[in-house]
Amino acid sequence: MSTVQTVLGSITPNLLGRTLTHEHVALDFEHFYRPPPPDFESELKAKISMSTLGYVRLYPYSSKENVRFYDEEALEAAKKDILLYKKHGGGSIVENSSYGLKRNLEIIVELAKSTGVHFIAGTGHYIHAMQDARNASLTVEQLSDLYSKDIITGLEVNGKMVKCGFIGEVASVYPIHDFEKHCIKAAGEIQEVLGCGVSMHPHRVTKAPFEIMRLYLEAGGRADKCVMSHLDRTIFDVDELLEFAKLGCYIQYDLFGTECSFYQLNTSVDMISDGQRIDNLMKLINEGLVDKLLMSHDIHTKHRLTSYGGHGYHHIYTNILPRMFARGVTVEQVEQMTVTNPANWLAFNP
């Protein structure tokens, strides 16, 4: 029988319910801090408030408070929004913080216990630039052993072993750093052995997802157990996206709620809107790809939580799905994207 490994133990896939496949509830994103524009320096250095929130929304990575998604205030705000997520029909959250993002399993376990939402934690490595010397020196064999151990044996949290339920997010820049290639290859090798799900984070270049999949597939990983994240900020042309879809992995639109006139992490492109995300997903559905689509928010800064004026983890369910229904998407198609596809991806299938 297939199972899904949550931080509180294994469950059958049908118990997951509606699932967000790419979120964070506690991580350190300070590596991506950007100095504020001189004209707004004082506003972005100030504490986030109603009078500064407009500046933070425009320049989210220029507020140090905003990218510190691990302090007590952030954790309280995240818990409040997870409870709202549950209230509006959410069942499970896949927490994608990996080595380099300072994944906090203790917090994830506490949130699972206190909210009743299923949490699935990931193993894997973020980009090379965010690794310490010990992690950055690991070989493919050592990485494979580590990922296998985190999934099979688990990690000790307050005297109990907590098992990871997938490999991810495995992140890379472009051109892909040698260490990141090792991580992708290790993920492919272990996926083949364990039958677990894998989640990839590509750089903000159209070629990156194709190269990641080549390395992963060559290492033995199954395409139908791999998610390519952040495609709504990576491949903007639908025809190119359809070409990428031929590789057989999951197509994930996971930046719902991110609507900005200036995308700080890639200033050469315009971030698409939620309306455009819906339109693109509908085009993919019409091409027969509904069984390969996933949706999420990738919340990783405070200003996206409701306590800071944001949309919270329930945004897709309360604001996006009604718009999709109004445009002709069926209940069955939504259930496929939010319930069935996540369960199929997360289920261990050796």
From Swiss-Prot:
Its EC number is 3.1.-.-. A divalent metal cation 1 binds at residues 22, 24, 169, 298. It comes from the Eukaryota. GO terms for biological process: catabolic process. Its cofactor is a divalent metal cation. It is an enzyme of class 3 (hydrolase). This is Phosphotriesterase-related protein.
